[in-house]
Amino acid sequence: MHFRVVIPARYGSSRLPGKPLADIGGRPMVLHVLDRALQAGAESVVVATDDARVQAAVEAAGHQALLTSPDHQSGTERLVEVAETLGWPDDTLVVNVQGDEPLIDPALIREAARQLVVHTDAVMATLAHPIHDHADFVNPNVVKVVADEAGYAVYFSRAPIPWPRDAFAAEQPMPHEIGALRHIGLYAYRAGFLRTYASLASSPLERCEMLEQLRVLWHGYRISLGVTPTAPAPGVDTADDLARVRALFAAV
C-alpha cells in the first residue's frame, strides 16, 4: 500500500502560538509527528506550514516542508495546495496527520490509508474509538461520530451523540450500550478529491460545529469510518497539554 502524508503545521495557534516548534525532549514537536508518519511507512512526508520558521526547522532536519498560504481555513485546504504544488496524480493516497499529535500511533496512520483502499466508493476515510468515559462523552472538545450499518459516517458533532432519550441524563453515568464513538482526527483522501474539495462551498453545519469534515457530508459524499480499539494518544492544544506530553516523553 502506497500513501503519502501531509502534516499541516500552522504557527499562529490562538491557544498556543508557535505550537509546531514547541520543544519536546529537545526537538520541535512537528519533527516528532514527522517521525511517526515515517514509521507508518509513508512513501513521503511533507510538512505544510504558514511560517518560514517552521519550514526552516523541518528542512534543517533533512525533511521536506512547503510554505503555504496563511489564508487557509483548515488543514484540508492546506493539503489541497500541497497536492497542486507537487502535481500529485488524482489517485495518490494522502493522509492528513495533525501537526499537534507527537504521540500518534503509526498503526493508526496506516489504518486510515487502508480504510480508503478498501472502501473505494468513499472519497475520504477516518477513524474512531469507543467512548467509555462519561466526561469524554459530554466534553465538546471530544468530537463524536455516528456511523451507519455499512461503516460510513452519518454525522460528526461536539455534542453527545447518539443521545439515548430515556436512559441518559448529564448527571448520570453514560449507558454503555449506546456505542458512542470518539472521532480520531486522521483523514485519508485521494488527491483527486482534494481538488474537488477546494471547489466545495463551506456548509452551515461546518461553521456551526467548526468541523471541516462536515463539508464533505453536506455535499453528499461518503466518509468511511474505521473503528479501532487503539485509543488516541493525547494531542497538544494548550500549554497544559504540552506540559503533559513533555512529561510522557521524559518518562520514556
From Swiss-Prot:
**The UniProt record lists the keyword Acyltransferase:** no
**What EC number(s) are associated with this protein in UniProt?**
2.7.7.38
Q: Where is the signal peptide?
A: none
Name its pathway. Nucleotide-sugar biosynthesis; CMP-3-deoxy-D-manno-octulosonate biosynthesis; CMP-3-deoxy-D-manno-octulosonate from 3-deoxy-D-manno-octulosonate and CTP: step 1/1; Bacterial outer membrane biogenesis; lipopolysaccharide biosynthesis
Q: Which CDD domains match?
A: CMP-KDO-Synthetase
GO CC annotations, alphabetized: cytosol
Which reaction(s) are listed as its catalytic activity?
Answer: 3-deoxy-alpha-D-manno-oct-2-ulosonate + CTP = CMP-3-deoxy-beta-D-manno-octulosonate + diphosphate
Tell me the superkingdom of the source: Bacteria
InterPro entries, A to Z: Cytidylyl_trans, KdsB, Nucleotide-diphossugar_trans
Name the predominant localization. Answer: cytoplasm
Places the protein is found: Cytoplasm
What Gene Ontology terms describe what this protein does at the molecular function level? 3-deoxy-manno-octulosonate cytidylyltransferase activity
Keywords in alphabetical order, please.
Cytoplasm, Lipopolysaccharide biosynthesis, Nucleotidyltransferase, Transferase
Q: State the top-level EC class.
A: transferase
Q: What does this protein do?
A: Activates KDO (a required 8-carbon sugar) for incorporation into bacterial lipopolysaccharide in Gram-negative bacteria.
Which PANTHER family does the UniProt record give?
Answer: 3-DEOXY-MANNO-OCTULOSONATE CYTIDYLYLTRANSFERASE, 3-DEOXY-MANNO-OCTULOSONATE CYTIDYLYLTRANSFERASE, MITOCHONDRIAL
Q: What NCBIfam families does its record include?
A: kdsB (TIGR00466), PRK05450.1-5 (NF003952), PRK13368.1 (NF009905)
Q: In which family does this protein belong, per the annotation?
A: Belongs to the KdsB family.
Record-given protein name: 3-deoxy-manno-octulosonate cytidylyltransferase
Q: Which organism is it from?
A: Thiobacillus denitrificans (strain ATCC 25259 / T1)
